[in-house]
Design a protein with these regions (language model features):
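Acidic, S/T/G-rich, low-cysteine, solvent-exposed domains in lumenal/extracellular/periplasmic regions
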Residues: 1-137
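Short, aromatic-rich amphipathic segments at membrane interfaces
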Residues: 107, 114, 134-163
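Alpha-helical transmembrane segments
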Residues: 168-180
Length: 180
């Protein structure tokens, strides 16, 4: 179906959770039925495999990449790190046949979906499954979570640096100006 699995784990140095390159926030390009109900277009994948899509697919085969890494993605093995943009989920269609591929089982891992309840992992997974059936609709109602929601900040390192060094510098400079 025009997809080749890459060797090793996929890491992303640009779109990751708190500096851990194997905790990836992929770029999501879900349109139509795949994008229904997505609130913030954020999905977290942990220790994901990946694959590449062939450029010459022929006339009847189409592959829609649903989740990809940034161009700063890496396929990491014991011996090498290969930089590139890798596909983490895709839908291939040829005639009446559809194949949906998700490269990471962590997409619906309860440890991730319970801890980060503001992510769209479950919704996108259900949309991808329902996309394979033309006459089925999602009638599920999301339960109200009573747990504390954790805030997921993508670029915490730069914000922390600005607050740790920037705010005291402004206070010190302001104090010296008033003192003089």
């Amino acid at each position: 179906y025009g997809m080749t699995k890459t060797k090793g784990y996929i890491a992303d140095t640009q779109r990751n959770y708190q500096g851990n390159y194997y905790y990836i926030f992929p770029e999501i390009s879900a349109s139509g039925d795949l994008g229904d109900g997505l609130e913030n277009n954020m999905v977290l994948l942990v220790n994901s495999a990946g694959f590449t899509v062939k450029e010459d697919l022929g006339d009847t085969l189409t592959v829609d990449e649903v989740m990809t890494t940034s161009p700063d993605g890496y396929a990491v093995t014991e011996n090498e790190q290969t930089q590139g943009e890798y596909t983490l989920a895709a839908v291939a269609e040829e005639g009446e046949a559809k194949l949906t591929v998700i490269a990471s089982e962590s997409m619906i891992n309860s440890q991730i979906t319970d801890y980060f309840s503001n992510l769209d992992n479950k919704r996108l997974f259900v949309n991808m499954v329902l996309n394979n059936f033309d006459d089925v609709e999602n009638l599920s109602i999301d339960p109200k979570s009573l747990s504390v929601e954790m805030n997921t900040v993508q670029h915490a390192g730069s914000i922390s640096t600005a607050l740790i060094f920037g705010v005291p510098a402004v206070v010190l400079i302001g104090g010296f100006v008033i003192w003089m």
